[in-house]
């Protein structure tokens, strides 16, 4: 990837966010394996996706950029400071397409919706297509969830603490 902008800031082709790989709760597979979601991911990325997410912790400029995506998605970021939300609202994300992932009911259980942004995941000299997935209901405003056809941890031999970059366009 060419360095066309500051990390965490919008640049002429979109936005770049750098984060630190972290372990999640291990529950994403329950949702990600659902056929209703997989069908939508197939339409979005042209392939089924790995039934799980890769979590990235973000801070500083990268957190502001991620909150700007959350704001575009209509997701409240109640735990963030009003100053941080104000700074995020000044970031221009109008060139980034938000793709709606519809929720559904199955056997009386509600599976919530989400918003996805197409991106490229980069680590070292390699990259793969992915999407930033922002669930309508989430506990963490500073954790970016990434979906991909690849099991990213295995594909890139990632461990907690590795720094990776996603580029949205």
How does the language model describe each region?
Residues 8-143, 160, 164-166:
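Long, compositionally biased stretches
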Residues 1-9:
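Generic low-complexity, intrinsically disordered segments
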